[in-house]
């Protein structure tokens, strides 16, 4: 005959006895909190208490739990579960219950806590995703409404379409020869603010392919392009007018047109310089006007802080033009003879003084240059500078790694292995000779190294310095302790290795094995 309610009645009686303190034969201390309980119940529900009472039952009346891992409310909850068979989290954090259950080897509670944490993480992730979707939808609606209103306000009228095309696109034969397939452009907002030169407006309005012969007119058009390109560089991010799109079928985007305008500007600078030398025999008035215009163009190119960067294929063109200018100025100014070495030094010094401010403006968006402190090379970004510096450090490390020929390095005569000092060499030579200089005074056993003798001496003193932190069993050697942990506490180690990253919860503690400063029992 079976009594189904017997187990429930037994637990109820034990719970009443615990509350009354009747026949309680142990006290569990968690920090400052004390819990009276029965050893039989604790050992039946927790593998920790089972191993704790297994060896010396009579000397274990008080049990100290690590308060850094097990909190008093969490242990009270688990104690109620042991006596009543019910687990009620109430307002207690699930993480604390998980830590206490893992410490006490209550694996059923550990599974329940992990399941609840996963459900909590899933619900939080779903709610966060819904909020992000709602916010992204609202942002898209706002951006669409703003974009439609902006485009409606920027649309030009059909009557002014032809005039805008004439004002915004200024092609010439010289530009097409410098960069075929690309044309220089200007935004509609700048057409009204910059007046055209007198010698330039009429030829472009009547015939687009007509070339200008005089240096003054060419420099005027070049200066006008430089001013317009400066204003375009400040407004790179703005949208082109729709009226210009019909004439820009060969241009892919604004950046390519911006680069082509810079190419045309560089080529015009070189050609204008040649024209200046060809027309040096003309009247002084034309020469003075040209010099004034050309100095303006050079100033706008070299000291313009709005130019952000330059394509890599323009660097050789600019360097060649600067070198030609420097050579011509040197030949015109220096009448006395110079050696080849002094000529090369002067040209290199001129290049550095002229290129350094220009590179400082175009290589870095913030107007910065990154120079190597060892070789004075200039780089466009700090990342490339770090890669370059690593080559210097590798060279220095290579020089350090090669010892000098006259330095005596401790080397083993049998196997050729090198060592940092003579002490390590002598220790290594014992592996070849079999020498064992350290002898135990009690049993006469010899050892090669002193630490092996110290480990052996514990056998004679019967000292057990290695203790298990879960069941407090003590061992003479550390290897015996490791084997004991693998045999009896392997599941605990695996359960405590679960980290907060696996659960995707930043609030979950990292339950790794840590050294406890308090003893578990006295």
Swiss-Prot record:
Residues with Phosphoserine modification: 157, 516-517
Residues in cross-link Glycyl lysine isopeptide (Lys-Gly) (interchain with G-Cter in SUMO2): 273
Region (Interaction with DNMT3A): 310-427
Pfam families: BTB, zf-C2H2, zf-C2H2_4
Renumbered zinc finger spans (C2H2-type): 370-392, 410-432, 438-460, 466-489
BTB domain location: 24-91
Region described as Disordered: 121-165
Matching InterPro entries: BTB/POZ_dom, SKP1/BTB/POZ_sf, Znf_C2H2_sf, Znf_C2H2_type
One cellular component (GO) term of this entry: nucleus
Gene Ontology MF: a single term: zinc ion binding
GO BP field: negative regulation of DNA-templated transcription; negative regulation of transcription by RNA polymerase II; regulation of transcription by RNA polymerase II; skeletal muscle tissue development
PROSITE patterns: BTB (PS50097), ZINC_FINGER_C2H2_1 (PS00028), ZINC_FINGER_C2H2_2 (PS50157)
Keywords, comma-separated and alphabetical: Developmental protein, DNA-binding, Isopeptide bond, Metal-binding, Nucleus, Phosphoprotein, Repeat, Repressor, Transcription, Transcription regulation, Ubl conjugation, Zinc, Zinc-finger
CDD domains: BTB_POZ_ZBTB18_RP58
Assigned protein family: Belongs to the krueppel C2H2-type zinc-finger protein family. ZBTB18 subfamily.
Role of this protein: Transcriptional repressor that plays a role in various developmental processes such as myogenesis and brain development. Specifically binds the consensus DNA sequence 5'-[AC]ACATCTG[GT][AC]-3' which contains the E box core, and acts by recruiting chromatin remodeling multiprotein complexes. Plays a key role in myogenesis by directly repressing the expression of ID2 and ID3, 2 inhibitors of skeletal myogenesis. Also involved in controlling cell division of progenitor cells and regulating the survival of postmitotic cortical neurons.
Subunit structure and binding partners: Interacts with DNMT3A.
The name this protein goes by in its record: Zinc finger and BTB domain-containing protein 18
Organism listed in the record: Bos taurus
């Amino acid at each position: 005959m079976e009594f189904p309610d017997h187990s429930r009645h037994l637990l109820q009686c034990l719970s009443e006895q615990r509350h009354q303190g009747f026949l309680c034969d142990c006290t569990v201390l968690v920090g400052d909190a004390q819990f009276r309980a029965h050893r039989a119940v604790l050992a039946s529900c927790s593998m920790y208490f089972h191993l704790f009472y297994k060896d010396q039952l009579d000397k274990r009346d008080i049990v100290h739990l690590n308060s850094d891992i097990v909190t008093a409310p969490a242990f009270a909850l688990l104690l109620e579960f042991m006596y009543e068979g019910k687990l009620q989290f109430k307002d207690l954090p699930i993480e604390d219950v998980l830590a206490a259950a893992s410490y006490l080897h209550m694996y059923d509670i550990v599974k329940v806590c992990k399941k609840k944490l996963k459900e909590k993480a899933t619900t939080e992730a779903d709610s966060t995703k819904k909020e992000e979707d709602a916010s992204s939808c609202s942002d898209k609606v706002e951006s669409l409404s703003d974009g439609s209103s902006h485009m409606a306000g920027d649309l030009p009228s059909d009557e002014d379409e032809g005039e805008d095309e004439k004002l915004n696109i200024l092609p010439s034969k010289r530009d097409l020869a410098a960069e075929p397939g690309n044309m220089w452009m200007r935004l509609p907002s700048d057409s009204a603010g910059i007046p055209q030169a007198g010698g330039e407006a009429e030829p472009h309005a009547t015939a687009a392919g007509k070339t200008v012969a005089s240096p003054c007119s060419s420099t005027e058009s070049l200066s006008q392009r430089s001013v317009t390109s400066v204003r375009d560089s400040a407004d790179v991010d703005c949208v082109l007018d729709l009226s210009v799109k019909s004439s820009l079928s060969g241009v892919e985007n604004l950046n390519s047109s911006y680069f082509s305008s810079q190419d045309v500007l560089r080529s015009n600078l070189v050609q204008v310089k040649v024209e200046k030398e060809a027309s040096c025999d003309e009247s002084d008035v034309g020469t003075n006007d040209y010099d004034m215009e050309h100095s303006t163009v050079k100033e706008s190119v070299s000291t313009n802080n709005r130019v952000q960067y330059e394509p890599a294929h323009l660097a050789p063109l600019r360097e060649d033009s600067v070198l030609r200018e420097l050579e011509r100025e040197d030949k015109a100014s220096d009448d006395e003879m110079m050696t080849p070495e002094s000529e090369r030094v002067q040209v290199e010094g001129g290049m550095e003084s002229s290129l350094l401010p220009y590179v400082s403006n175009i290589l870095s968006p913030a107007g910065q240059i990154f120079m190597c402190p060892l070789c004075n090379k200039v780089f466009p970004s700090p990342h490339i500078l770090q890669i370059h510096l690593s080559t210097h450090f590798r060279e220095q490390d290579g020089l350090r790694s090669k010892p000098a020929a006259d330095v005596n390095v401790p080397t083993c005569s049998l196997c050729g292995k090198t060592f940092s000092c003579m002490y390590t060499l002598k220790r290594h030579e014992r592996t070849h000779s079999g020498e064992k200089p350290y002898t135990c005074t009690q049993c006469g056993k010899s050892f090669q190294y002193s630490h092996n003798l110290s480990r052996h001496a514990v056998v004679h003193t019967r000292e057990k310095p290695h203790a298990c932190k879960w069941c407090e069993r003590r061992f003479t050697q550390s290897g015996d302790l490791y084997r004991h942990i693998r045999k009896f506490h392997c599941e605990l180690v695996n359960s405590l290795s679960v980290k907060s990253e696996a659960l995707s919860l930043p609030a979950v503690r990292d339950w790794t094995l840590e050294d406890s400063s308090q003893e578990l029992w006295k």
